[in-house]
Each structure stands twice: as structure tokens, then as C-alpha cells.
Regions:
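Short, extreme N-terminal segment that most often corresponds to the first beta-strand
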Residues: 1-34
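Charged interaction segments
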Residues: 28-141
Length: 141
């Protein structure tokens, strides 16, 4: 059986930040980080077009969680996954956040979920460390 090494892969997830009293500045900073990403036309694996940018003026006063979602489809991104993760981690280093989740769905090796967690209560740009763990689920079919 010949394998298709250029099978479609889908990457999606979200970055969450719980805003506090200085939340508006954090939201502006996060927005600048997302807008500073390269365009999809640059062939960057992580690019600004894959993100849904939350509007700064539209927020529910009942909640304080900023959710920045993203998604894209690729041909065989799992073969360049090291580089995708490096680019995503570089973005996270520039942002305020409390957690991030990335799902990688591949036709060949199932679903991988990457969970990014701060080492404290909040990741501060260029100052805080974070950890990542991977969970793998493969369809038995």
C-alpha cells in the first residue's frame, strides 16, 4: 500500500488570557503580537490569517477571558511540525496568556493535542516560562 506523504493535516486551537485591571493593555499587546505575524503569502507556517482577532471594543462585561482562536489546513505539516511549534512558541513568548491548546489532526497518525501551561498564574511577554505536554489519540479504524 502506497502512503500519501502529502495528506491533509488540520491545525486548530485557542489561546486564553484572563484579563485583570490592566486587561485592556494586555488585549492591545496580544493584538499587536498577532498582527505582527507574517502574512500567509510569506509561506510562514504560523501566520496572521489563521487567527480570528477579537475586537477590542466588543467584550462581555460578565466575563474576563479573552479567547484567541486559530485554524488552518496544510499538506503534510506533521513533517514540519518541529518548525510549526517553534513559530507558535515564539508567538506565545510575545503574549499575555494563561493557557493555549493546539490540536493537530492528521490522516496518517490521528489526533495530537498540545497543551501549553504557564509556570505561574500568567505568562508575561518575554519574562515567563511555560511548559507543553502532548496527548495522542489514534482512531483504531
Amino acid at each position: 500500500m502506497k502512503k500519501d506523504f502529502q495528506a491533509e493535516s488540520v491545525v486548530y486551537g485557542c489561546i486564553k488570557h484572563i484579563t485583570a485591571s490592566d486587561g485592556l493593555e494586555h488585549k492591545h499587546s496580544n493584538r499587536r503580537a498577532l498582527l505582527g505575524l507574517p502574512s500567509v503569502e510569506s509561506w510562514s507556517l504560523v501566520n496572521r490569517e489563521m487567527f480570528g482577532l477579537p475586537e477590542l471594543g466588543c467584550s462581555n462585561t460578565e466575563t474576563s477571558t479573552q479567547v484567541m482562536h486559530f485554524g488552518a489546513s496544510y499538506r503534510g505539516v506533521e513533517y514540519e511540525w518541529k518548525y510549526w511549534l517553534e513559530q507558535f512558541e515564539n508567538l506565545l513568548r510575545k503574549m499575555y496568556w494563561v493557557s493555549a491548546t493546539v490540536h493537530l489532526e492528521t490522516e496518517l497518525s490521528g489526533l495530537h493535542s498540545f497543551l501549553f501551561e504557564t509556570c505561574g498564574n500568567l505568562h508575561v511577554p518575554h519574562q515567563s516560562e511555560f511548559n507543553v505536554r502532548c496527548e495522542w489519540a489514534r482512531d483504531p479504524g
